[in-house]
From Swiss-Prot:
Protein source organism: Acidovorax ebreus (strain TPSY) (Diaphorobacter sp. (strain TPSY))
Cofactor names: [4Fe-4S] cluster
Keyword Transmembrane carried by entry: no
One biological process term in Gene Ontology: aerobic respiration
A GO term for molecular function: NADH:ubiquinone reductase (non-electrogenic) activity
Keyword annotations from UniProtKB, A to Z: 4Fe-4S, Cell inner membrane, Cell membrane, Iron, Iron-sulfur, Membrane, Metal-binding, NAD, Quinone, Translocase, Transport, Ubiquinone
Pfam families, alphabetized: Oxidored_q6
Gene name, Swiss-Prot/TrEMBL: nuoB
Class of this enzyme: translocase
Bilayer topology annotation: Peripheral membrane protein
Family: Belongs to the complex I 20 kDa subunit family.
Function: NDH-1 shuttles electrons from NADH, via FMN and iron-sulfur (Fe-S) centers, to quinones in the respiratory chain. The immediate electron acceptor for the enzyme in this species is believed to be ubiquinone. Couples the redox reaction to proton translocation (for every two electrons transferred, four hydrogen ions are translocated across the cytoplasmic membrane), and thus conserves the redox energy in a proton gradient.
Taxonomic lineage from the root: Bacteria, Pseudomonadati, Pseudomonadota, Betaproteobacteria, Burkholderiales
Reaction it catalyzes: a quinone + NADH + 5 H(+)(in) = a quinol + NAD(+) + 4 H(+)(out)
Stated name of the protein: NADH-quinone oxidoreductase subunit B
Length: 159
């Protein structure tokens, strides 16, 4: 983040890197637990793994207070409009992590008539976490991958 330190004690950096550093250190996730993957998501937030070390400390119940949605579990056709409505209520910038085989592509229930074959058909997904169910470590790795993606974005439009 810091490009240069001058002898007078000044630190030089770009506006993009400061803003992106702040964004990565203060992710506010919103739970959208739909099945057994939600148990692993709660496990990741508990004391053993402590998501607070990675900047995703407090899970929010309101979409207006969150900028990260973790879709964990099987998304059925009846739940898809609710998922989209909650996503639309989130403030910009917003990110989505698809957690588990069912959220990624339907999983075990892929050929069922009532299951959406991937939540990316409803909302844009930034990071996919594989597994059935994925471990808490896999979710933490997915959050770290999202933080790296955020660091590469540009806040100021380039000419």
């Amino acid at each position: 983040m810091i490009e240069g330190v001058m002898k007078e004690g000044f630190i030089t950096t770009s506006y993009d890197s400061v803003v992106n550093w702040a964004k990565t250190g203060s992710l506010w996730p919103m739970t959208f637990g739909l099945a057994c993957c939600a148990v692993e998501m709660m496990h990741a937030a508990a004391a053993r793994y402590d998501l607070g070390r990675f900047g995703a400390e407090v899970f929010r119940a309101s979409p207006r207070q969150s900028d990260l949605m973790i879709v964990a579990g099987t998304l059925c056709n009846k739940m898809a409009p609710a998922l989209r409505k909650v996503y639309d209520q989130m403030a910009e910038p917003r990110w989505v992590i698809s957690m588990g085989s069912c959220a990624n592509g339907g999983g075990y229930y892929h050929y069922s008539y009532s299951v959406v074959r991937g939540c990316d058909r409803i909302v844009p997904v930034d990071v996919y976490v594989p597994g059935c169910p994925p471990t808490a470590e896999a979710l933490i790795y997915g959050i770290i991958q999202l933080q790296q993606k955020i660091r590469r974005t540009h806040t100021i439009a380039r000419a």
